[in-house]
């Protein structure tokens, strides 16, 4: 059933529209052995509740538009323990929530190979996101990537081609707290920022703000030798710590 997806909204009988799915005040635990844990065609909204997801493909997938949380709310709790890709839509907005992701490809992905000339976008304006991928990009948009609020901690895989933050268009950091780590520090990315951030990896370090250094420096601080990757026996959670000598929770807007 449902192509072995956990939950799927398919096409409606109305030729002018496709089905949508809204999740509100539910507690769901889904293990999808083949395809997506939750799949919607036109619109997927996760407003509140608790989702515990594991899947062989994408944990949360929508062909077009996905909204997670809402401004002024605590939003949902989403724990993705295992997936190929974590959260995928052509246009993805995260406004609130507590989200943890462990996957083997992109943690957040704005893409759809069936759409041409689409304004692909990832927009993060609130919530707490802790994401780790073993072999992909942390956040990957085929268009723009904008972080204007929230607390973001992301690790990308060991492959030098992968970046913690990756976009075909502009990456804009205008608010929130951002810590991104991986083998590539994203030196070639099209980054526009108006506030403090930290991006580091074995290929280099970049950053700005009042860290005791100039843009492009790290204020004398050194990243962990393992590239910021969590220990193999660690579990992702809202206070996830990657190593004994490095604690992203300590890096708040007050001491960046």
What does each of the following model-derived ranges do?
Residues 1-256:
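A composition-driven surface/loop motif
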């Amino acid at each position: 059933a449902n192509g072995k997806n956990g939950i799927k909204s398919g096409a409606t009988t109305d030729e002018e529209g496709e089905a949508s799915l809204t999740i509100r005040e539910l507690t769901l635990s889904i293990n999808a052995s083949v395809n997506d844990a939750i799949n919607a065609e036109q619109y997927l909204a996760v407003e509140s509740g608790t989702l515990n997801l594991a899947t062989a493909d994408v944990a949360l997938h929508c062909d077009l538009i996905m909204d997670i949380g809402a401004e002024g709310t605590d939003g949902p709790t989403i724990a993705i323990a295992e997936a190929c890709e974590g959260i995928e839509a052509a246009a993805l907005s995260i406004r609130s929530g507590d989200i943890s992701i462990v996957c083997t490809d992109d943690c957040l992905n704005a893409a759809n190979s069936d759409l041409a000339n689409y304004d692909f976008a990832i927009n993060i304006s609130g919530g707490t996101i802790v994401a780790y991928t073993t072999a992909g990009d942390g956040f990957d948009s085929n268009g723009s990537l904008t972080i204007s609020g929230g607390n973001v901690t992301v690790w990308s895989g060991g492959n030098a081609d992968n970046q913690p933050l990756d976009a075909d268009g502009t990456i804009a950091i205008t608010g929130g707290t951002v810590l991104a780590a991986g083998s590539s520090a994203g030196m070639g990315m099209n980054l526009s920022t108006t506030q403090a951030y930290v991006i580091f990896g074995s290929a280099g370090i970049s950053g700005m703000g009042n860290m005791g250094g100039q843009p492009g420096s790290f204020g004398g601080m050194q990243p962990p030798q393992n590239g910021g990757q969590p220990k193999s026996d660690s579990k992702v959670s809202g206070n996830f710590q990657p190593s004994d000598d490095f604690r992203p929770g300590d890096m708040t807007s007050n001491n960046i």
